[in-house]
Amino acid sequence: MKKIITLLIIATLISCETNVVKVPVKAGEIALGPNTGSKFYLTSDDNVDIVKKLLESWNNMDPAGMFEVLEDTITWYVASEKKPIVADKNFIVEYMSAYDSISQVVQGYIPHQYEGQTSNVVSVASRETKFKKDGTVEDDRLFERFFIRNGKIFRVMAWSAVWNTN
């Protein structure tokens, strides 16, 4: 009888199904603006892949590759400018024509959203070195946010940090 009860218990345990419910972990807080108090949560790495494709094309100075993951026109907040630039493919081609090469080395990617947001954001910290055709070199430490909707980047916001000389 003990064997039958033991077998029934084992069979019951084996037949149990564990349901894993994935709940987004919310953390942090928006401190300013209309979404003050909203929490952040992580999103899919598919968004990271979109940004990686963009930056690979950026490093290769390949506008056609860039526009595989960019909308036809994007809003680009360049770190050195006070106002955003509305950039299309022709603008990017013209912009890149001043450079011999570009090297952007990324330190990390964080895909996220805040509560109620419909687009996804990938935050990126990187070092970017651009070599101009006139021989000058632009060297920046960047923090950027890439805004994605329907699998395409529609806005890029960039901030630059001063190099520590200590």
List each model region and its residues.
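Positively charged n-region of N-terminal signal peptides that target proteins for export
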Residues: M1-I4, E17
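Sec-dependent N-terminal signal peptides
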Residues: I4-L13
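Short, low-complexity N-terminal intrinsically disordered segments enriched in polar/charged residues
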Residues: C16-N60, E68
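Short beta-strand edge/turn micro-motifs at domain boundaries
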Residues: N19-K22, D139-N166
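Hydrophobic pocket/interface hotspot
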Residues: V51-L54, G65-F67, I74, D88-I92, ...
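A solvent-exposed, acidic/Ser-Thr-rich amphipathic alpha-helical stretch
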Residues: F67-Q113
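Short, cysteine-centered beta-strand-loop-beta hairpins and adjacent loop/turn segments enriched
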Residues: S101, T129-D139
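A short hydrophobic beta-strand element
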Residues: T118-E128
